[in-house]
Amino acid sequence: MRLAFWLYEGTALHGVSRVTNSMKGVHTVYHAPQGDDYITATYTMLERTPEFPKLSISVVRGQDLARGTSRLPGTVEQVAKHYNPELIVVAPSCSTALLQEDLGQMARASGIDENKIMVYAVNPFRVAETEAAEGLFTELVKRFAAEQPKTEKPSVNLLGFTSLGFHLRSNLTSLRRMLKTLGIEVNVVAPWGAGIDDLKKLPAAWVNIAPFRELGCQAAGYLKENFGMPSITEAPLGVNATLRWLRAIIAEVNKIGAEKGMAPIEMPEMRDFSLDGQSAPSGVPWFARTADMESFSNKRAFVFGDATQVVGVTKFLKDELGMKIIGAGTYLPKQADWVREQLEGYLPGELMVTDKFQEVSAFIEEEMPELVCGTQMERHSCRKLDVPCMVISTPTHIENHLLGYYPFFGFDGADVMADRVYTSAKLGLEKHLIDFFGDAGLEYEEEEPEVFTEPAMSGNGTVTSSAEAPAEAAVATATATGELSWTAEAEKMLGKVPFFVRKKVRKNTDNYAREIGEQVITADVFRKAKEHLGG
């Protein structure tokens, strides 16, 4: 039944495809029923690349099951002839995992060289998207990484960048720019854009950079254990984190450089990291102290998403923009302990760990923060609640797969995040001002024609004025149903409350009315509630 609702994580099949679709010369064959070919539509809809997804389905039909036959060997053979990939990854879907078939034996029956086939028989009932992707990438690194002489010049590997990653290409560009400024070359980016030969030469780099807690850290750990390669796992989200990231890279590279007798790398001038090469690399340090951004000081923010983004964005909002964090959470339970450790001292209460968007939405409705940083799910929830929201984590929609340069990593990314915070919350304030003061003559609405209303006749035969009738009708309705009702005048007064706290004010007023025994909230009751609640 969960599939009838939004899910934060996709299936294991989705995680496998994110890795293989990122690579060159790698094709995936899914042993699955026809319906599981939805995965190709996901990439053609969201991924802004000219290539078609490198995925094929070995269709399992009910007739095949009855006969005890399998199409898998024939499908693998067809893929090998048509696409000629260097590697074919065979994986089961949730449906075919129930059959408990030996995929390795069936794949070998295709007659294709075993060295060109990799069976990744992950259990899709126990493993979801993130864990499946991390597991497959680690297995690929274990299989193909080979001892290599180190590159002559300082170099790094960038691990964990995958298809459908959050602002993938922009983040890569930002990291490449900073590394180039340091004079450090990129040996391999994997899995994004990597082929089998690239995986083989991973050990040639001096340092591994794995900024994503969800993907790449296990592979970096394997390379460290087996090839002695140091790794840097912090994500450069924000100015402070980027400076730490740069210093960590310089320190690790200089250790290896000293063994080779090379001159140490020095931290360049900060302006060298800027887009124009003349100004500060980020405007956040001074912008955060302007009158505009000072108004954000102590504004309440809630952050939800994957582990990497939640930790980085939470620290950025509090440490660099001065916002008040009222809560944070993640949909990845296996990363929860790491997130708690990283955010110790940042949260007023417990970390929210859930994969149910309804629980996150309920928290937002209860707290009504001034800003929510979340996923596409939170964007939908916040639209219903009239709460400003910016997307900072997968899952995302087309709005976060842009052709332009919008990184979240590095100095450039700090500027993008600050802009998103500012515009998300400020545009919300603009909406409130328009609600409060009107459209200032920008639009002219036609006046509604006057409608003559006959005086209402009460039960005892007396005439009631038209102004009194609605209030009496509201009382009658409320008495009959036992529910609270609001008069038109009270609703009008509520409309002058800023939209981002309006629901909370309505709820508090309802509670006050129940306490004093009122069933109809009039303008007078609304004013009393406001005084009682300290507003």
From Swiss-Prot:
Superkingdom per UniProt: Bacteria
Binding site for [4Fe-4S] cluster: D36
Keyword Amino-acid biosynthesis among UniProt keywords: no
Active-site residues per Swiss-Prot or TrEMBL entry: D292 (proton donor)
Pathway: Porphyrin-containing compound metabolism; bacteriochlorophyll biosynthesis (light-independent)
Reaction catalysed by this enzyme: chlorophyllide a + oxidized 2[4Fe-4S]-[ferredoxin] + 2 ADP + 2 phosphate = protochlorophyllide a + reduced 2[4Fe-4S]-[ferredoxin] + 2 ATP + 2 H2O
Pfam families: Oxidored_nitro, PCP_red
EC number: 1.3.7.7
GO molecular function: 4 iron, 4 sulfur cluster binding; ATP binding; metal ion binding; oxidoreductase activity, acting on iron-sulfur proteins as donors; oxidoreductase activity, acting on the CH-CH group of donors, iron-sulfur protein as acceptor
Cofactor: [4Fe-4S] cluster
Keywords, in A-Z order: 4Fe-4S, ATP-binding, Bacteriochlorophyll biosynthesis, Chlorophyll biosynthesis, Iron, Iron-sulfur, Metal-binding, Nucleotide-binding, Oxidoreductase, Photosynthesis
CDD domains per record: Pchlide_reductase_B
Subunit details: Protochlorophyllide reductase is composed of three subunits; BchL, BchN and BchB. Forms a heterotetramer of two BchB and two BchN subunits.
Similarity comment text for this entry: Belongs to the ChlB/BchB/BchZ family.
The protein's name: Light-independent protochlorophyllide reductase subunit B
Gene it is expressed from: bchB
